[in-house]
A protein has these predicted regions:
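Sec/Tat signal peptide C-region and signal peptidase I cleavage site
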Residues: 18-26
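Positively charged n-region of N-terminal signal peptides that target proteins for export
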Residues: 1-6
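Bacterial N-terminal signal peptides
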Residues: 8-19
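N-terminal secretory/targeting leader peptides
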Residues: 11, 26-116, 124-127, 131-328
Length: 328
């Protein structure tokens, strides 16, 4: 009682009261990604942030930074590890510099449908990769979608690997993608996503490869004429928290954050699924020439890539992947 009176007197002298002391300090968490605000990543991130803020009564507040405002994916990963950034949505393949086994998500022509991939990443494959990320102080909350990647260029329609011969193609900065396009006969080179539009505009590259949603929302139709639906990779993405940030959230609020991450994973996937057909039509309206592709010769051309990388990922991880490919 005496302690309370003493504390009250001290607060009164400072012009405060016991009621002025917040029960829990609100936590603002920077969440960055490299895509445009019109992309499903950002729309889903907005829903995720709103749900978390409401359900934690403002105790946890995700502040969104789209369009590479916090840097490219490599920079954001570094920020997550050193503590300058709390959260991010990052293409899963971009985790390869800190854990090479994440390259398994980039193996060409792994999945025949998005639903097949969902089962793998929401199941044992995603759990195994999340465990590897945890060892690098990263908490993967959920597996989002980048979608099937397709090729655009300014030279002509791509119907067979021979059409890629010598084509200077921008690829993501990872060895797997470089090796894949080298096997297909192209002349690939890496470049950060934020520099891609201007590089295409200045004709530094003839071609690039991305999902339809990114091709459209990034306005690549302004600087590329041909779209070939190669579907060479189905790419996942991750909603990631730095482990030190996750540990600052109370167990009660962690449950809220995780539930919101699962909900908005499903919503983001729906956005991609619903929009892909629309994007083909929209890209045609913007003047792009679109062609379907017989995938068989492309699959044959990249078979050596699979053989080369199996030892890198190990029998256990490759075994899990193959189980889901066979329809487990």
């Amino acid at each position: 009682m005496q302690l309370t009176r003493t504390l009250t007197a001290l607060l009164a002298a400072a012009g405060l009261s016991l009621a002025a002391i917040p029960a829990a300090q609100a936590m603002d968490i920077k969440l960055g990604h490299v895509l445009a605000p019109s992309h499903s990543w950002h729309k889903a991130a907005e829903g995720f942030a709103a749900d978390v803020k409401e359900q934690t009564e403002g105790r946890v507040n995700f502040v969104l930074f789209p369009s590479g405002q916090l840097g490219n994916e490599k920079t954001m990963l570094e920020g997550l590890q050193i503590g300058s950034q709390g959260a991010a949505i990052i293409g899963s393949g971009s985790l390869q510099p800190i854990e090479p086994k994440f390259g398994i998500v980039e193996l060409p022509y792994t999945w025949t449908s998005a639903q097949q991939a969902y089962k793998a990443y929401d199941g044992e494959l995603g759990a195994a990769l999340s465990k590897l990320a945890a060892a690098k102080n990263l908490v993967i909350l959920s597996w989002w979608e980048n979608g099937f990647r397709h090729l655009t260029n300014n030279r002509g329609p791509i119907n067979t690997p021979a059409d890629l011969e010598g084509l200077k193609t921008r690829v993501t900065p990872d060895k797997m993608r470089l090796d894949t396009f080298t096997a297909l006969g192209a002349n690939p080179a890496p470049l950060a996503f934020g520099e891609l539009y201007s590089a295409l505009q200045q004709k530094v590259f003839d071609a690039q490869e991305n999902p339809l949603s990114i091709i459209y929302t990034s306005s690549f139709f302004e600087v590329q004429k041909y779209l070939s639906l190669t579907g060479h990779v189905w790419g996942p993405a991750n909603l990631i928290l730095a482990k030190h940030t996750w540990n600052r959230i109370s167990p009660e609020d962690q449950k809220i954050v995780q539930a919101a991450a699962d909900k908005w994973r499903d919503e983001q996937r729906k956005m991609i699924t619903q929009s892909d057909d629309d994007y083909v039509a929209k890209l045609k309206e913007k003047g792009m020439q679109v062609n379907q592709v017989d995938k068989a010769p492309f699959i044959a051309a990249v078979a050596p890539v699979w053989k080369a990388y199996e030892p890198v990922y190990g029998a256990e991880l490759m075994g899990i992947l193959q189980q889901y490919r066979k329809g487990q």
